[in-house]
From Swiss-Prot:
The keyword Thylakoid does not apply. Its EC number is 4.2.1.33. The gene is leuD. It comes from Oleidesulfovibrio alaskensis (strain ATCC BAA-1058 / DSM 17464 / G20) (Desulfovibrio alaskensis). Belongs to the LeuD family. LeuD type 2 subfamily. Catalyzes the isomerization between 2-isopropylmalate and 3-isopropylmalate, via the formation of 2-isopropylmaleate. This is 3-isopropylmalate dehydratase small subunit. Pathway: Amino-acid biosynthesis; L-leucine biosynthesis; L-leucine from 3-methyl-2-oxobutanoate: step 2/4. InterPro entries: Aconitase/3IPM_dehydase_swvl (IPR015928), AconitaseA/IPMdHydase_ssu_swvl (IPR000573), IPMI_Swivel (IPR033940), LeuD (IPR050075), LeuD_type2/HacB/DmdB (IPR011827).
Amino acid sequence: MQYNGTARKVGDHIDTDAIIPARFLVTTDPAQLGANCMEGLEHGWVSRVQQGDIMVGGKNFGCGSSREHAPIAILGAGMPVVVAHSFARIFYRNGFNMGLILIEIGDDADRIHDGDVLSVDVENGRITNHTTGDVISCPPLPPFMHDILDKGGLVPYVRERLAAGDA
């Protein structure tokens, strides 16, 4: 899996209420949630996002309350990948469960700036910054995570396994 897009950089400790404020939790529709993605950080933030852009976070991205709406909002805004210094653990699990690709890169997140053009090679654990020429190595995801992501998240993955008699 390779993803190409423009970096949409946010800071440290971006909580789930910044990603999708509680007032927008009246739906689970990805398009509606995506239209309000990062509204708790900056009004209209999502208007700069193009389909396929890559969110780049700082430390502890996705902290705060556990809400599946947050990764759905990011996906609904058209961003299939979040690269960050680190993730809050509950957000990390929720993200993969919803089909959002999350990659931790530690201090290398500081080498990516808003507007940089990126390629993220999930299978080989490589992020190429075409703006600066930097190549960042990261651990590739384990095969079972690829299987979950390929199916669009944990629920579709389990449904398929149950239907096939594998579970």
